[in-house]
C-alpha cells in the first residue's frame, strides 16, 4: 500500500462540515475528490478522523481525550503509581517538564499531562499531527479536560531536527516511543498500526533520535519498548522498568529534585 498523500482525500461527513473539510484539505495539501483514494480524512460531528477505504476496513481512528479510553484512564488509571509516571520521575512535589518526541496519538503525553506535567509533543507525520491538533482543540473546549490540554503543546516536524535546534529551556525529561516492527497485539493498536504504518513505517532512525534526546534532556531520557525488544543501538540504559507487555529503558543524567 502506498504511503503517498496523493492517495488520501478529505471529505465532510455532512454538508455542514464542507467548509471545515476544505480548510483541512488546503492546510494539508490534499484533494477533496479522488476516486482511487485508499484513505479518507473525514470531518464530522466527532472531529477529524482517518478512515481506511476498503471492504473489510476497521473503523476510523481519531484522537479523543474527552471520552472513551482516555477518560477511563484519567479517572481510573492508577495516578502517579503508573509505570510511565515512575519512568519519567514523577514523585511527590516533582512534575518534570517532558518532551514526548514521538507523540503519535498523544496517549502517553495525555497521561503525563493528567498527572500534572507540562508536556511538549512532537509529531512528524502531517496527517497524525492533524488528528492530534484536532483532538487537543476539542479537549481545550471541554470543561473536564481543558486544564490538562493547556499543559500540552504540539510541535510539528522532524524530532531530531527540532531537538538539535531547540530554543529556550531544555526539557528535563525526553520520552521516546519509536514505532517498532512487532508491537502490542491488542485490537485497538492493531487497527491503528494498519492505518498508520503506510505513512510512518518503522523508526529506523531510532538511534539518532536517542542520541539527540540525550544531548538535549537535562535530567533523563525514557524509551518505551516492547518488553522483549532489544534496547536502541547506542548508549546503554542505566536501568529499566518492566511491565507485562512494555519496558521503559531509563537513561539518567541528573537527579530530579522538587
From Swiss-Prot:
InterPro entries: 16SrRNA_methylTrfase_J, SAM-dependent_MTases_sf. It is an enzyme of class 2 (transferase). It catalyses: guanosine(1516) in 16S rRNA + S-adenosyl-L-methionine = N(2)-methylguanosine(1516) in 16S rRNA + S-adenosyl-L-homocysteine + H(+). S-adenosyl-L-methionine binds at residues 107-108, 123-124, 177. It is found in: Cytoplasm. Its EC number is 2.1.1.242. One of its GO terms (cellular component) is cytoplasm. Gene3D superfamilies: Vaccinia Virus protein VP39. The keyword S-adenosyl-L-methionine applies. Pfam families: SAM_MT. Its main location: cytoplasm. HAMAP family: 16SrRNA_methyltr_J. Specifically methylates the guanosine in position 1516 of 16S rRNA. This is Ribosomal RNA small subunit methyltransferase J. It comes from Stutzerimonas stutzeri (strain A1501) (Pseudomonas stutzeri). The gene is rsmJ.
